[in-house]
Amino acid sequence: MEITLFDPIDAHLHVRENALLKAVLEYSSEPFSAAVIMPNLSKPLIDTPITLEYEEEILKNSSNFKPLMSLYFNDGLTLEELQRAKNKGIKFLKLYPKGMTTNAQNGTSDLLGEKTLEVLENAQKLGFILCVHAEQAGFCLDKEFLCHSVLETFALSFPKLKIIIEHLSDWRSIALIEKHDNLYATLTLHHISMTLDDLLGGSLDPHCFCKPLIKTKKDQERLLSLALKAHPKISFGSDSAPHFISKKHSANIPAGIFSAPILLPALCELFEKHNALENLQAFISDNAKKIYALDNLPSKKAHLSKKPFIVPTHTLCLNEKIAILRGGETLSWNLQEIA
């Protein structure tokens, strides 16, 4: 059995910086045509010059790959700065509630504050797409749900602003997407295939720790259903986020799952298992092209076949290991060729 996926798109990707970027970027830039690049670096991408500098670093270390750059939402994003960004081809804003995830200490503390709403108004005028890490302070399994009132306010106040709920993790968010025309979402491999049991049902597995948390069986099944039918308001976004094993095995474990090396084979395996391979093309590419109005992307054909693929346990960067999701396991699909 074989399948060819055309122009795969990752609508949510972390490729880090410097040596780590060089170590992990190829896992995404080779099989994917494009990816929405997250701006929460150690020095966040708060303006156009910094963002373009980072884009150049990505382009220098890849080929036939389009990084879709995003700005880190902040009060300094004036109308003039947003116009400057748009003129340079930047079309995404990423809003992080303060302290909710990695490098979100510079995030937005008042989500409905006057300055936040002013930036959103200007973003709507200029046709930006708003990507939201949709969590608010509260019980860990309810953080996404607790953000619903903010998302509804955004959707109603800015009806022409396209809003993406990043890495959807709570089944209760599905109704929100179906209620508002301008609300969309991305789904990760881990949220549609894993539950809290994978994280802490046996021994604690730090390599399955992410934000938002993988949740209950009900959440996983409902989200998987969206993916399997390639719901038109949903696109694939891996949220692949590498960390060194030395940090993952520390007393202060960073959130993030490095899934990039297995994405296409694992998705083929999952969709085939549920007799939905015919919908994978829409989930992995077609929906994103429509939602984000993407064109003139690098052409890619990812050829996969149903042959065993033993997942490496890790990759290396500066003699440090980075654990790969499902490392040591054998997947039933293998990425054979990229053309």
From Swiss-Prot:
Residues at the catalytic site: D239
InterPro entries named among the record's database cross-references: DHOdimr, Dihydroorotase_CS, Metal_Hydrolase
Enzyme's top EC category: hydrolase
Hydrolase listed as a keyword: yes
This protein's pathway: Pyrimidine metabolism; UMP biosynthesis via de novo pathway; (S)-dihydroorotate from bicarbonate: step 3/3
UniProt keywords, alphabetically: Hydrolase, Metal-binding, Pyrimidine biosynthesis, Zinc
Its EC number(s): 3.5.2.3
Amino-acid positions noted as binding substrate in the UniProt annotation, renumbered to this chain: H14, V15, R16, N40, H133, H243, A255
UniProt-listed GO biological process terms: 'de novo' pyrimidine nucleobase biosynthetic process; 'de novo' UMP biosynthetic process
Reactions accelerated catalytically: (S)-dihydroorotate + H2O = N-carbamoyl-L-aspartate + H(+)
Binding site for Zn(2+) 2: K94, H133, H167
Gene Ontology MF annotations: dihydroorotase activity; zinc ion binding
Modified residues (N6-carboxylysine): K94
Family, per entry: Belongs to the metallo-dependent hydrolases superfamily. DHOase family. Class II DHOase subfamily.
Protein purpose: Catalyzes the reversible cyclization of carbamoyl aspartate to dihydroorotate.
Full protein name: Dihydroorotase
Lineage, uppermost ranks: Bacteria, Pseudomonadati, Campylobacterota, Epsilonproteobacteria, Campylobacterales
